[in-house]
Amino acid sequence: MDDYTQSINDAVKCLRQGGVIAYPTEAVYGLGCDPFNHDAVAQLLTIKKRSIKKGFILIASEWKQVEPLTEPIDPKALARVFDTWPGPFTWTFPASKEAPHWITGQHSTIAIRVTAHPLAKLLCQRFAGPLISSSANQEGEPPIRDVKILRLVFGNKIDKTLEGPLGPTHRPTPIRDAITGEILRL
């Protein structure tokens, strides 16, 4: 990861200044920002042409980065979630009052993934918190896996691009309900 130190530091600086970045994830390039910066989230919504009602997925390097945003759930259900993390699995949890409405959208839940992607994980570690992780595409378009296409589609709308290898998965991560285990998206 030493090859990426400066790029990650630049991306973290951009995030702290309220910027929107692109970065590699388990499956596709993601667009993200500081989930607690309303202006940054509004900019991301504009870039993606996405409704605030849909909400966003958060990625984290570890559970403790996102735990305050969730209500407690049954320990057995939580153990089932932890069995899949870190990894390419997103789970929805009951949102706590700490979770901003612009993250949850019209939902009473919050979608979370503890990532195993080395660069995304390091990005969350250096940022010292979770990030919004939304596939790099505009509403209704396929997610982007190639940095050249990313630049062509988004141009200077994105403040910083962290280039790096994508994970081995070719589809966005599945989403499951943390309480019931129900599959919400495959």
From Swiss-Prot:
Compartment(s): Cytoplasm
UniProt GO molecular function: ATP binding; double-stranded RNA binding; L-threonylcarbamoyladenylate synthase; tRNA binding
Principal EC category: transferase
Function: Required for the formation of a threonylcarbamoyl group on adenosine at position 37 (t(6)A37) in tRNAs that read codons beginning with adenine. Catalyzes the conversion of L-threonine, HCO(3)(-)/CO(2) and ATP to give threonylcarbamoyl-AMP (TC-AMP) as the acyladenylate intermediate, with the release of diphosphate.
Name used for this protein in its record: Threonylcarbamoyl-AMP synthase
EC number from the UniProt entry: 2.7.7.87
InterPro entries the record matches: DHBP_synth_RibB-like_a/b_dom, Sua5-like_dom, TC-AMP_synthase, TC-AMP_synthase_SUA5
PROSITE patterns documented for this protein: YRDC
NCBIfam families: L-threonylcarbamoyladenylate synthase
Keywords: ATP-binding, Cytoplasm, Nucleotide-binding, Nucleotidyltransferase, Transferase, tRNA processing
GO cellular component, one term: cytoplasm
Reaction catalysis annotation: L-threonine + hydrogencarbonate + ATP = L-threonylcarbamoyladenylate + diphosphate + H2O
Record-annotated YrdC-like domain positions: 5-186
GO terms under biological process: regulation of translational fidelity; tRNA threonylcarbamoyladenosine modification
A Pfam family assignment: Sua5_yciO_yrdC
